Amino acid sequence: MMRHSSLRLIIGGLILLLFVLNVFSKEQGSHSHKRSHSAKRFSRDSNSARERRPNIILILTDDQDVELGSLNFMPRTLRLLRDGGAEFRHAYTTTPMCCPARSSLLTGMYVHNHMVFTNNDNCSSPQWQATHETRSYATYLSNAGYRTGYFGKYLNKYNGSYIPPGWREWGGLIMNSKYYNYSINLNGQKIKHGFDYAKDYYPDLIANDSIAFLRSSKQQNQRKPVLLTMSFPAPHGPEDSAPQYSHLFFNVTTHHTPSYDHAPNPDKQWILRVTEPMQPVHKRFTNLLMTKRLQTLQSVDVAVERVYNELKELGELDNTYIVYTSDHGYHLGQFGLIKGKSFPFEFDVRVPFLIRGPGIQASKVVNEIVLNVDLAPTFLDMGGVPTPQHMDGRSILPLLLSRNRAVRDNWPDSFLIESSGRRETAEQIAESRARLQIERRNMKLANSSLLEDFLEGAGESTTIVSSSSTAATLMSSTAQQPEDGEEEVETDNEEDDVDGDGAMDSSAAALEEDDLDDAAFEEGDEELDQEFQQNNDLPLAPYITKMMRLNSECSDPALLKNCLPGQKWKCVNEEGRWRKHKCKFHLQLEHQLAAMPRKQYQRNCACFTPDGVVYTKIRAPSAGLHRVNKRTHNGPGRRRNKREVFHTELPDEMEELLDLHQVVDQLVDHTHRSKRDLPASSNETIAQVIQQIQSTLEILELKFNEHELHASNSSGNSYERGEKYTKSGGHRCFVDATTAKVNCSNVIYDDEKTWRTSRTQIDMLIKLLKDKIGKLKEMKKQLRESNKQALAAGRRNDNRRRNDQSVLDSGAGPEFNMSYFTEISSTPRSNVVGQTEVFQGYGSASAFDSLEQTQSHRFTPRAECYCEPDVGENHADSKEMAREARRKLKEERQRKKERKRIKKARLEKECLSEKMNCFSHDNQHWRTAPLWNDSPFCFCMNANNNTYSCLRTINGTHNFLYCEFTTGLITFYNLTIDRFETINRAAGLTPGERSHMHDALDQLKSCRGRSCSIRRHQNHLEGGSSAPLLPINQVHRNNKRKHSPLAGAVGNYAFVGPRLDMEALPPIKRRKLSKYNRLTGSQQSHMKRRPWKQTPLQQSPRFLRTHSVTPAQA
């Protein structure tokens, strides 16, 4: 028994052990299976993950329309994307303006949520960078494991100083669209391009960089998904096409829609009421602009095919979503508007939208609404990332991949269209101003406290200086595109973006006006301040004054060196104050300094005449009296320098000359009156003044004549000659009444400064009086000719005789040698040591001076001067020359800008209008063929009161546009019966209809996130009638279709054809669909036409009214 019991125990233990082992092995297997499944689920590099997360490519154009038929001239794109994928017939932008629309595309938010109102207001601002830019679809997909790349235009005010978050490969265009002469930020390095098609044509470079990004991404990690954005500048201005396409698409008139040149429009907003019909030159311009736009799109068409072929070669075509769309539409002549965007009509808000990818049925047509705010949620859905709550859009993948009818039935049928510009009320404007003033006051207080800490603590000072030095280094190493505009060929005046500026309301204008009042910058550093403000990512140092900022920035040793290639700024210390200069003017400054004439009196010289007279030329002191303080014009084409002479004692004759100078000025003012008002005694008065001046001048010349004779008698010792005369009258010379000789003080001969001062005084007065004599003679001549009866020949001869006596002493040579009063000559000095230099005097431009100079050359022998070696110019003179060279460069730049300003003002003189945005066009706007050879013109295409909010609804029963303007105007367009929106039917709305649409619009204007999606049937009018008739040109949702070749599609550039939605009809009355006739390729054989009756109850009594609007209702 014991043996059996023990045996049973052993067997039971074995069984229990086997059972435990079995359970344990199962548990291990289940855990290993879970781990492998989890690894497959979350591994980014697994095959299953690769299948779930496809590649995403967005191809974005700029200003491409649908209503004008531009997409029909891109056969490659239509064949690869439309025929190979799906087409959304109702794709719209929520704001028809570049920067707001692109900001909505990146963030999936309406304008009233991301706060980018215009192309200038908050576009790529620090606020945008800190809040919304960090939440773009690129950041979410990059964090989810996608390799992201962006190439092309980004935002209009992107300055290239940073790389937006979320993009691993970055090639963003700096500022607005261009095809040549642009700069890009390529992975943090700024690259400037020129005007060479082979190297610089931007659409081709975008395609090349994108293809290189795809190749490198798959070579590095073939299983990692890719997000690529290709943002082309076409067909935005300046519409520079590739040379091989410049001969295509002439005489294309697809933009001549029924609303083309439909002007004026008294039932629409103010800008359309005042717009007159286009002139013939305007129509020619729209035709040529349409041609150039189509030509630029050919490069995009080729790029789409290149990317398609590259994906095919890489084996990624079936695993890649390719989305093709535009930021907004465009108009050319519609309602008399020559060109532009920013209107809520179909031609500005409707955009092309094509998509192909895994799971998308080929040649599929989708009639549900898709918006630009839906792109970001769609991309996140493609990548398996849940849509954030702040995004206003929704993913469109269910429309493409799901066959559930409930998805289409619940899809939103209404959306919001917002114009660019703020919409604050008067109370909000006042609140914004008060808040801005408080912020400025707080900033000043913070700066004052920071300054105290800056002065007290040395450590903090070092920190501030080091951070500012880093900022200065970054600024000196970067070159901003807008500041280099003077050296570039300006090919785009950006008048297309003027639309956004006009939509700004009074609040933004008031804030800008306040900012202008506070911007008090000095002229020399204005461009520096602009660049400092544009670099948004640099640390903001709260400097109190500009001098503090310059002291901090110029502490960087890199800015103290001479200008090197690629260096932009250079710091120069001028008299203890730092100044920043642009290096691009450095070479010009050197050339100016090399070409400037040098002064002659820079060396000490001894001069000898053939008569044995010896005199010296002594260098003037560095702070001498030769500095130019004022420039006066003395006639056309001639300048003279007027020196200030500070003296304490003047001779009596000089004081008399100063009094005479005032008398002459009074006579000049007196003769400015008309000749008939001058009295007959004016001639006699002028003659008396001339005689008085000449007598005083003779005394002065007599003094210097005696001085010259005295100098020749004592040439052996020039400092002993003053000892023969007694000192009298202070530091000056005087005429002895008894001997009629000139006596001078010894100080004049011993002190060089006193001698030079005395000489300069007399020299100045002599030249001044000679000028006055010339003017008085001209005045006298005019009076003598005008008064033929008064002046006798004797007085004229007497005046001539007196003039001859004052100039020449009959046969005795000149009384007075002008070589003592020689001014600085413009002849450059020579650097050869010991070279003979000849100094010659010159007088004024009057007849007296020219006669004296002629006589001086005739009777005075030429002197030879020997000068000491050149030791180089002193510091003061070199600074003066550099200052003069900079002044000349500045004047040259100012003249260049002034010429441009005058030319622009001349072109825009007739089209400028208050609170309107206008542009001018001439033959200088386009630089590539085909050129504009017609006459220039101006046109105003938008106004700042064109600010609106619109409700757009498209469903099975209704197709309308309801708008409310800030001016109080209400417009309503029924596109079911008026597809081109030519008639405003707001007067025909009932109060209930208007109230319902107003409430729906208010709901959308303040919506956020999910509340921005209004479900279908929720927006139907009160007492909703269910009319079976769809909007015109409606297509069945799930209908597959083929398209004819391009030649057949050009004529029918809009919808394929009218269809009827038969889902609302009973099955017995539905039309039967026929198969597509592949032999004929006809687009009209989708349905077999069968007449059917429509009961009166099936028609909508509200929106099918065709009565016209009376003038009173309009």
Curated annotation (Swiss-Prot):
Localization (cell): Endoplasmic reticulum; Golgi apparatus, Golgi stack; Cell surface
Top-level EC class as recorded in UniProt: hydrolase
Protein name: Extracellular sulfatase SULF-1 homolog
Designated gene of the protein: Sulf1
Classification lineage: Eukaryota, Metazoa, Ecdysozoa, Arthropoda, Hexapoda
GO terms, biological process: heparan sulfate proteoglycan biosynthetic process; motor neuron axon guidance; negative regulation of canonical Wnt signaling pathway; negative regulation of epidermal growth factor receptor signaling pathway; negative regulation of smoothened signaling pathway; positive regulation of smoothened signaling pathway; synaptic target inhibition; wing disc anterior/posterior pattern formation
Organism: Drosophila melanogaster
Catalytic residues as annotated in Swiss-Prot or TrEMBL: 98
InterPro entries tied to this protein: Alkaline_phosphatase_core_sf, Extracellular_sulfatase_C, Sulfatase_CS, Sulfatase_N
Cofactor comment text: Binds 1 Ca(2+) ion per subunit.
Predominant location category: endoplasmic reticulum
